[in-house]
Amino acid sequence: MAKKDNGPLVAATNRKAYHNYHILDTYEAGIELLGSEVKSIRKKEVSLDGAFVRIEGMQAYVFNMHINPYKYNTVTEVEPLRQRRLLLNKKEINKLKGHAEIKGHTIIPLEVYFKNGWAKIKVGLGKGKQLFDKRDAIKKRDLSREMEKDFKNKIKF
């Protein structure tokens, strides 16, 4: 019998990225990992807090992505915060590099997930939000929640 595909298995999301940045564009990239790191990601022992992407030469790397060491690993000890290479096309790297050089723009990892058995990372091109932008977003979110509550209460009666 064929195995059901329930969509991608999301291991970690970077919620602060959506709060601190306007996400202009997103890209899907593969990650160069060791075997024990893949096992840890499958167990959702990965954190994207403070992670960022930097392009060095013609390669993209993710820094500060914390992957807990797999506790049953006996072969080699893996550093949890090591830099990991992202697998992107040359065209995508050039595009990201050009946009990242603009003042106020940065490349941020948004999600780590599995797609067809392969570990992927969703990378976003972000522009930093100002304090008033963040306050605006919070006000809009609160207003929409209140409107939904009022609407639900009207339907009940």
Curated annotation (Swiss-Prot):
GO term, biological process aspect, one: trans-translation
Transmembrane parts of this sequence: none
Gene Ontology CC: one annotated term: cytosol
Disulfide bonds listed in the record: none
PROSITE patterns given in the database record: SSRP
HAMAP family: SmpB
Family indicated by similarity: Belongs to the SmpB family.
PANTHER family (alphabetical): SSRA-BINDING PROTEIN, TMRNA-BINDING COMPONENT OF TRANS-TRANSLATION TAGGING COMPLEX
NCBIfam families, per the entry: PRK05422.1 (NF003843), smpB (TIGR00086)
Stated name of the protein: SsrA-binding protein
Lineage of source species: Bacteria, Pseudomonadati, Elusimicrobiota, Elusimicrobia, Elusimicrobiales
